[in-house]
Amino acid sequence: MTGVVYAFPWNAPRSAIASSYLTYDQQHRRDRMFAALLHARKVLFLQPECVRFDVYRTAAVLEQNQGSQRANAFLISFCKKALPRLELVAKKYECSGINSNVSAAVFDGHFDTQLMQYLASRMVNMVARFNRLPDMSRADIDLLAADIANFIRAELADIDDTGFSELKTLYTWYMRAGFISLQFNVTPPKWERVTKKYFCEDEIAPAVMRMFNEVWWRGRLRRIAAAWREHLQIAVGNVSKKRHAYASKNCVTDWREQKRRTREFLKGLDLEDEEGNRISLIEKYDGSVANPAIRRCELMARIRGFENICNELGYVGEFYTLTAPSKYHATTKAGYRNSKWNGASPSDTQSYLTGLWARIRAKLHREEIRIFGIRVAEPHHDGTPHWHMLMFMLPEDVERVRLIIRDYAWEEDHYELRSDKAKKARFHAEAIDPEKGSATGYVAKYISKNIDGYALDGETDDESGELLKETAPAVSAWAARWHIRQFQFIGGAPVTVYRELRRMADPETARALSVEFAAVHDAAHYGRWADYVNAQGGPFVRRDDLQVRTLYEPRTEFNQYGEETVCIKGVYDASIGAGSPILTRLTQWKIVPKRAVDLAVDVKGASAPSRSSVNNCTGSESDPPILDLTKPLSRRERRELTNRLRKKKPTTRRKFIHGTDKQNVAITKTIDEIHSDNRHHNQPGRSPAPDGRW
């Protein structure tokens, strides 16, 4: 069919200039989208800056690459899915208002006087600032800590304790300060003992001093702020296998920076004894269990010793894995948001696992089943902890131990354990097969993975898919942020005595004390953990039945809260008594700043001092080392370059040199006239004359 031919071109029909009208359904859909977008922007504005920054940045990238419609859809979807999760986190940290206990104790339940209104305004101001902790800098947090401490101090000074005994006065002070502390989600020291009326003056007085101490509040608020920020990152999904496994990027950065600052601080300090002899503090630090390599070696030696004891006693090894129910996990195994999450933090999950194990241990004790071993706490990709346990027991107790642990592990939220896969995820047991490897080999990977990634080159993580060598810092940052104890031995002898005996390098003195003491010392001296545990009484020895114990003595000085502190002085044989100890710490050391000469020598790459007493050459501070910018800079070179750029050069002022005595007289006269004019100007009622003079 041919087209219609018109006589003139303008006779042909043309398309409409305006678009067709929207249908009612399209209009309602558009209005709902606008309303949802406005609501999303409104609620997002109320969230902490650490959350808004990432969301706005992602929306800006989407708008630039895919258009504004895609960015708006992202904002609406984010607020719909993530806002309930953020509200769960906020309920755990925010202060919704002034508690009734604080209102009754501080304001007497009324605000009709000017003083009460002033106190209420201060309290409201501090509560509002507390709710902004995730976005506050360290200086702002320290300022809030000082304000809270001063507020509590003023409240305690205002209490009328006339006619009170000393104990009643301390109790009144404690309860008033405790209510204010609870207002800011900080549990007062000794709170459970004091509320149960099971305390003495020596315990309650230091607790009161802590609650009006600025330094104490500073540490509590910093810890809350750090946990709050990390919990928000978990809620929005930034801690997962899709973003950053185990810990957020800022958490790992803060951990690295804290480690660097700690080392820089220790490098400037020395240990000095009574005679003035000095040793480097950083060298002693690196030679202790604070060094990850030494810590890992000690853990491996201890677990190897437990395995030797297991073989001697005819025990068998079992490897268990305990995982919390799904409501404790923020994201799924695939990295998506878990709709069952109840807002639990990693510390909440660790508390659940600790309570679960306490019930299991009590059940085993009631049935007289004895086990010993080690448990390792490590995170899932979303930061939720789970436990790996290597336990040794009698062969006839294996099935009963498995049954007890399984029943307690499956008890909570058992309705979700409908498949074998779900049951295995909650609790998994595996017998140690000597043909496949030793018991130590089962946990060696977990120990190295959670410390420094030693001997794991090329191996990848099962959850995140990243190299284990690269995920080790994230795991350490996770444990430090949530204050989770990664390794704990169950059974055996205390490691403190073991370390003190290794400091003692005199076997003759040990043999002179007793044969039993010498056996314990020799085992510790040569690093034989199995022999040490057996010499102390075996893997199930009670603390009251130890052969060798640690000797503690009180210090001569008290701490800043008036408490008596104790320190380790040595060890003693329990059969002989603490009256005949062996002192392992004879020298009293104190931490002092390094000498200026030592600091100059310790600077790596610094210029050597001149041979003469006068150095006329330009110092290294004016001539910094030239960096080779043709190749990538190392981390240390980048930091030095940044510090050099930030450093301000001191402004040098030229000293005015007066010419002659006549000029000096003129200058002095001018200064006197200026002072005279200022005095006249400051007099009340003075007005300027027509010529401008006062």
UniProtKB/Swiss-Prot annotation:
GO biological processes: DNA replication; viral DNA genome replication
Comp. bias (Basic and acidic residues): 634-643
Pfam family name, one: Phage_GPA
Keyword Nuclease set for record: yes
Enzyme class: hydrolase
Task performed by this protein: Endonuclease which induces a single-strand cut at or near ori. May act by forming a covalent link to the 5'side of the nick.
Family note: Belongs to the phage GPA family.
Protein name: Replication gene A protein
UniProt lineage: Viruses, Duplodnaviria, Heunggongvirae, Uroviricota, Caudoviricetes
